[in-house]
Amino acid sequence: MSTTNTAAASQDACYISLLGLAEYFRTSQPPNVKKCIQCLQALFTFTPPSKVEARTHLQMGQILMAYTKNIDMARQHLEKAWNIAEPLMNFDDVKFDTASVLAQLHLQTDQSSHTAKAMLRRAVELSQHNVYWHCKLLLQLSQIHASDREYSLASELLAVGAESAEEAGATYLKVLFLLSRAMILMIERKTNDVLALLNTAGQIIDNNIPNPHQKEYLKVFFLVLQVCYYLALGQVKTVKPSLKQLQMSIQTIMAPNWPTDEAIFGANQLEMFVWLPKEQLYVLVYLVTVSHSMMAGYMDKAQKYTEKALTQIEKLKMQEDKPILSVFKVILLEHIVMCRMVMGNRELAIREIAAARDVCLAVPHRSLLKRHSAQLHCLIGLYSMSTSFFEHAERQFLVCVNETTERDLKLFANLNLAIIYLRTKRDADLKQILDAVSTENTHTYSSQALMGGFYYVQGLHAFHKNSFHEAKRFLRETLKMANAEDLNRLTSCSLVLLSHVFLSIGNSKESMNMVTPAMQLASKIPDIHVQLWGSAILKDLHRMSKDAQHEKDAYANHVKYSENLIADQRKCVQSAHHELVNWFQGDPPVTSGAAALILSEIPTTSALQPTTGQQFGQFY
């Protein structure tokens, strides 16, 4: 008996020594992965017990995944670990860690997520007795369903997680599940359900989270969702108090005296869940601030915050290039592209569209490109439209409409298509698209900004039919919606069009009353398209009132805006990235070569000057 014990002790000593050596080689600078793997491989020569064997296979799989490109070997080790661990009792950490890592590997290597989901479903089923693992696996599985746009399934899993956390008395974890579910419901546009969940979660955060640091983290998550909820509805004014609160909360969390995430969440296993680390939350708050600034019509602010956020992203990428940082970067670039176009910097916009394309193409399996392809087509459509390539713009918007499942993006693209049909005098196509938009959005609650835009396009349509009374009716509706929520760009576009309506019916006093605030707002934004249009109206108004000096000033301004746009147009068509206007399917082309000279396609000065029938700008 003593000989057996001695042999077992000796074998244990070998295991411990080999594991210690393996860890030593792994943590060396630089890591000696080959020797680390050799030490772990040597363990198998001792015919170790099942639990040791399974744990070693798991470690081998993790090391091969983290430090090598030998994914097939990693998969073999992880599958062996799972086959050994699955039937074993009291072996939860290795069993469920293996399932989690193996699911990640399947996601990285497989064409579909089917195998990863099946693996996690089995692990969820086996883990019901272990709240920590059950909740962790539920979160992982719901994330995959959400990425696959299977939102109902993701929502159901998160509801199960909230119940499990509640049964275990894990209040912090329950709130995380509630807020995660609210986020999914927001994507599904289930407005009332989102509000109910946010109210429930908000009350728990206020009254039932004793740890002040955890409370602040949950508050940031809650406020991000609340801000996104209001912004999705175009409620730029309503959101201001929540946004201010969010900005104060993130400053609190980023303060030097704030404890580390490990100190806040490391004490209790059921509190070891963090939505996003604070450095990523910091970027996210910048992102929603950029979104708010852009919607409110503060382009300079949006640019300033974008630059800060992109700098922060690059710092974080140097530490560890997490996939979510690429997502943040693409969304920021999408926002700033629209700001550039409003300001008339279209050459910079196409460069930034190309930068967004590069970020998407750098992500494996084109997963980011698949999610953002429709948005990229929409941005290229806006760019094509602003550079008077209307055929390209139309095709880009149609691709966007066909690719996207997001109702707001579809509405946005359709409104711009309507403006193209107006500009190109395609009345039948215009009627068809306006009827379709009207039917689709009558029974649903869309963004106030987009619905205001819909009324604006109808006003524009009425103006071009010389139905001035009808145009005024639509534009007053637009102004009512825009003023209610401080949508400055929509306000300035509506005012300048209304001014043109009054000019057309000979009411110069009302025309002046509209164009003056339009120009003031446009210079604040700044919106070069409204300034160009407004300066043409002012020139006509001053000529009518025989005010030669003011007429001369307005004309000088008009020429300045026009020349700026023409100079920018010239740069655009000489840019290598201009070739993106011809991308309609598959992967976008790489456009970093020599500039393609298409000078023959530069519009003449008159094409950019707002004579009657041409001064529409884009609706973005």
UniProtKB/Swiss-Prot annotation:
Cellular compartment(s): Nucleus, Nucleoplasm
PANTHER family (UniProt xref): MAU2 CHROMATID COHESION FACTOR HOMOLOG
Name of the protein in question: MAU2 chromatid cohesion factor homolog
UniProt keyword annotation of Zinc present: no
UniProt organism field: Drosophila persimilis
Record-linked InterPro entries: MAU2, TPR-like_helical_dom_sf
Domain of life: Eukaryota
Family affiliation: Belongs to the SCC4/mau-2 family.
Biological classification of the source: Eukaryota, Metazoa, Ecdysozoa, Arthropoda, Hexapoda
Biological role: Required for association of the cohesin complex with chromatin during interphase. Plays a role in sister chromatid cohesion and normal progression through prometaphase.
Alphabetically ordered keywords of this record: Cell cycle, Cell division, Chromosome partition, Mitosis, Nucleus, Repeat, TPR repeat
Self-association state and partner proteins as the record states: Interacts with Nipped-B to form the cohesin loading complex.
CC annotations in GO: chromatin; nucleoplasm; nucleus; SMC loading complex
TPR repeat ranges, renumbered to this chain: 452-485, 492-525
Keyword Cell division: yes
GO biological process, one term: maintenance of mitotic sister chromatid cohesion
